Amino acid sequence: MDYISLGKSNLMVSRVGFGAMSLGEIDTDENASALVHKAYDAGVNFFDISHSAQESEKRLGACLYGIRHNVVLATKACVLDARDLEECLDDSLSALRTDYIDLFQYETDEKNIVAFDEIAAQMERLKERGKIRHFGLTTEDFEIAASALDSSVFASIQIPFNILVMKQVESLVKKAQEGDIGFVAMKPLYGGLVRNIPLALGFLYQYENVVPLWGVRNIEELSQILYFNAHPPLVDEQFESEMENIRAFFS
């Protein structure tokens, strides 16, 4: 497993990120634990969840019991007032069975709801109290992500990035790298529409600062991701042709 620094933070994260939003939907606690521990045993150390998925947070907290300090744990919260971040954080800390979050992300798709400087000020207070180590931003909106990068207050941004949303978001990848800001790619399979895992992975691995966040649902999916992470496809003319075929199909 390869590891990269998440921007200018001191967080070294696995190149395979584990998106745990669906963990609460797995049929048993035992199967959820088996999935998380298979990823961990393969070297995955970056686990991402959300305050909005309380059952999944609780499951993840239980699964990481005993190994929590060996992983980079990220969660996020959507608020209308920066002062509400701490309440959401406290909920997540309880659910995740931990006393700190490595990466706490402000989540928004609405422009100008809360000013970034207000978010940053509150996040800094949470850092001073030892509740978080770093803070980032999660959004599905290109303009919000661009503004966040321009503000330089966040350690990372998380936004959908995949074969089908390449051209516009690619500029953000470059800007993040230039600003030494971590870039987490959510929806690498475009919410399941792209079924070719090696193609999706090979595309993202062309960008050395990008950490794909895979929404893992079962052992079979995880096994494929881990296999192609260890054996990435060759980016050649055939690879490019297959990417263009997928884009043409969805255009």
Q: Predicted segments — roles?
A:
Residues 7-10, 41, 60-69, 90-99, ...:
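Acidic (Asp/Glu)-rich catalytic clusters
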Residues 24-28, 48-58, 78-85, 111-114, ...:
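Acidic-and-aromatic substrate-binding clefts and catalytic sites of carbohydrate-active enzymes
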Residues 58-76, 121-130:
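Alpha-helix-loop-beta-strand connector modules within alpha/beta enzyme cores
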Residues 93-113:
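Active-site groove signature of glycoside hydrolases
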Residues 108-251:
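Beta/alpha (TIM)-barrel catalytic core signal, keyed to glycine-rich beta->alpha loops juxtaposed to Asp/Glu
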